[in-house]
């Protein structure tokens, strides 16, 4: 627990590497097309709970893992964003299922420590191209759904992207009150 607190308060945060391919603005919404690197990720899946509750539960498990709850007892340092896979229902609301990802820090990419919590899996993910929009505040389900709808409208019918899921991303620790960064990502097809 101490490692988790130290990680969130004192560590520098390593950001998931990406390259901006293009920028756009439409319908009063700014967005970017980015190429994100692949790599090793710690993943927790939670089902049967509302989005906000499931996301918080999974994120706490991942924070404990990078804080030292692993076979090496290694405090790995925090990475950003915490990336939540959301699965939209037909009406645009979110299903009661999330997969929360945290990219393993670069120095542990080659050989990630094994999680002590069996619900955490280590997955290799390929790089991907995304459409991204950013917003501030303490993001909840309603905010992510709202910005996903805005991004969908801004992209229009010209852009091809996955419709069966999207990513809800938070970059900041809970104790940061101002200047928060949240993003919605659609994966380009």
From Swiss-Prot:
The keyword Cytoplasm applies. Its main location: cytoplasm. Transmembrane segments: none annotated. The keyword Transcription does not apply. GO terms for molecular function: heme binding. Keywords: Cytoplasm. It is found in: Cytoplasm. May bind free porphyrinogens that may be present in the cell and thus facilitate removal of these potentially toxic compound. Binds with a high affinity to one molecule of heme or porphyrins. It binds metalloporphyrins, free porphyrins and N-methylprotoporphyrin with similar affinities. Forms a distorted beta-barrel structure, with two helices that are packed against the outer surface of the barrel. Porphyrins are expected to bind to a hydrophobic patch on the outer surface of the beta-barrel structure. Monomer. This is Heme-binding protein 1. It comes from Gallus gallus (Chicken). The gene is HEBP1.
């Amino acid at each position: 627990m101490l490692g988790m607190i130290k990680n969130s308060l004192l560590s520098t945060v390593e950001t998931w590497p990406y390259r901006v391919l293009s920028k756009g603005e439409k319908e009063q919404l700014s967005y970017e097309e980015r190429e994100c690197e692949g790599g090793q990720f710690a993943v927790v899946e939670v089902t049967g709970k509302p989005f906000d509750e499931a996301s918080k539960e999974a994120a706490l498990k991942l924070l404990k893992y990078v804080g030292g709850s692993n076979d090496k007892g290694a405090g790995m340092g925090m990475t950003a964003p915490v990336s939540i896979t959301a699965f939209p229902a037909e009406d645009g609301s979110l299903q009661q299922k999330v997969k929360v990802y945290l990219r393993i820090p670069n120095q542990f990419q080659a050989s990630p420590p094994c999680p002590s919590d069996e619900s955490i899996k280590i997955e290799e993910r390929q790089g991907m191209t995304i459409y991204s929009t950013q917003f501030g505040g303490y993001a909840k389900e309603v905010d992510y759904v709202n910005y996903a709808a805005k991004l969908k409208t801004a992209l229009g019918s010209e852009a091809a992207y996955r419709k069966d899921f999207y990513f809800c991303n938070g970059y900041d620790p809970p104790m940061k009150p101002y200047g928060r960064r949240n993003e919605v990502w659609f994966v380009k097809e």
